[in-house]
Amino acid sequence: MKKTLCIICLGLAGLAATASAATVELMPDIASITGQGYNSAGRLAGNGITAADVKNWLGPAGRADGWYTTTGNGDMKWGQASVNTANQSITLPNMNGTAGVCAGLKMTIENIQDYSGLSFSMNLTPSGTTGTYTYSVWYDTRDGEMVELCKGTRNNDGSPWNVHYDLTEDQLRAMKENGNGKVYAVVGSSGGRGGDNATVEDLSLEGTLAVPEPAAASLGLLGLAAMMLRRRRVRA
């Protein structure tokens, strides 16, 4: 009897363990980056970025999901951000003659209702000590409104910039209620000396996917344990 009850308890413990949350990487691999000019690109590369800028640059319905880049004056002749698919990184070059450079991602989150948490993270390593770096994350609503989730700016001091942001419960709830699944991330560099490049790595948008509680199995094992204890008392 004791051995059987012990097995039941171990089974319950195992079921409880399977109810833990799982983390899923939602951001797609960096496969390429496309030059895409914008007439107010100077704001995209800096802290003055607006919802309208993101919507007009990345949000058009005909624009496919993926990574895009532009310079601060919208002219690709000055150069652009580049990607390294082997180590999944993006290089932001500082170039004379332009207000800056940025890289932006348009992506889709499927089944957002299944997630109990979302978090954005990245690591930026500069090669010099000039310029300013920014990042921002946004989502699109079914009504066509672009909503900011987070934004940050840092004056370059030559040290790495490690970013991590967890969406609040209110933000995630609003995304589930109003979002259309489209999410955008923009990373920019402005005001730097020519040749002072930055490397952006470990770009991530993780979702916490809650595993449903195996309630039926748990109740069944609890019922069996209770029945065996009752039979034991009757025999005693």
Where are the regions a protein language model picked out?
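Terminal, low-complexity interaction segments
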Residues: M146, R154-L209
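N-terminal targeting leaders for non-cytosolic proteins
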Residues: A22-M95
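Short, charged juxtamembrane terminal tails flanking transmembrane helices
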Residues: R232-A236
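Bacterial N-terminal signal peptides
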Residues: I8-L15
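Extended, low-complexity, turn-rich repeat/linker tracts enriched in Gly/Pro/Ser/Thr and Asp/Glu
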Residues: I112-D114, T125-Y133, R193
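A short, hydrophobic C-terminal helix/tail in secreted or cell-surface proteins
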Residues: E213-R230
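Sec/Tat signal peptide C-region and signal peptidase I cleavage site
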Residues: A17-A21
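Short beta-strands within extracellular/lumenal beta-sheet-rich domains
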Residues: Q88-Q113
